[in-house]
Amino acid sequence: MRVEVGQIVNTHGIKGEIKVKSNSDFTDVRFQPGQVLTVVHNNNDLEYTVKSHRVHKGLHMLTFEGINNINDIEHLKGSSIYQERDHEDIVLEENEFYYSDIIGCAVFDDQKTPIGRVINIFETGANDVWVIKGSKEYLIPYIADVVKEVDVENKKIIITPMEGLLD
């Protein structure tokens, strides 16, 4: 099964580099040189091998092997990028999850009160932060003191909110 790992938002320069907004985890592995990515453009699957990767202003800057000119890549702006979900170089440790398993999960507090659903995840360096959409939008740190249970199979998460977290 493949998962969406990003979207091409623009080009950069004239040598075929693209700007990718990632919506995936493990980007250090998924976007490393030599990895094969599938770009879906006009319902066609186009496979590209990553030639280079760097991060600039929160976006992933990629070049693909065989693409050396902006004209060869510009038409792909807005296209989604996919990769196989179960990547051979990614080993999940205990309490690690694929973003695609967490996004969409219903979130409840430890009293079983519904809070909302996970709509996005972003990395802060220290820990991931889950964006929960309910009556309001909440930012929930993925730390053991807050997230008590993750049931991927039933798409359910239990948290113990620290004081002020849901205000």
UniProtKB/Swiss-Prot annotation:
Main location as per UniProt: cytoplasm
GO molecular function: ribosome binding
Coiled-coil annotated residue ranges, if any: none
Compartments, as annotated in UniProt: Cytoplasm
Function text: An accessory protein needed during the final step in the assembly of 30S ribosomal subunit, possibly for assembly of the head region. Essential for efficient processing of 16S rRNA. May be needed both before and after RbfA during the maturation of 16S rRNA. It has affinity for free ribosomal 30S subunits but not for 70S ribosomes.
Assigned protein family: Belongs to the RimM family.
Protein name: Ribosome maturation factor RimM
Source taxonomy: Bacteria, Bacillati, Bacillota, Bacilli, Bacillales
Gene encoding the protein: rimM
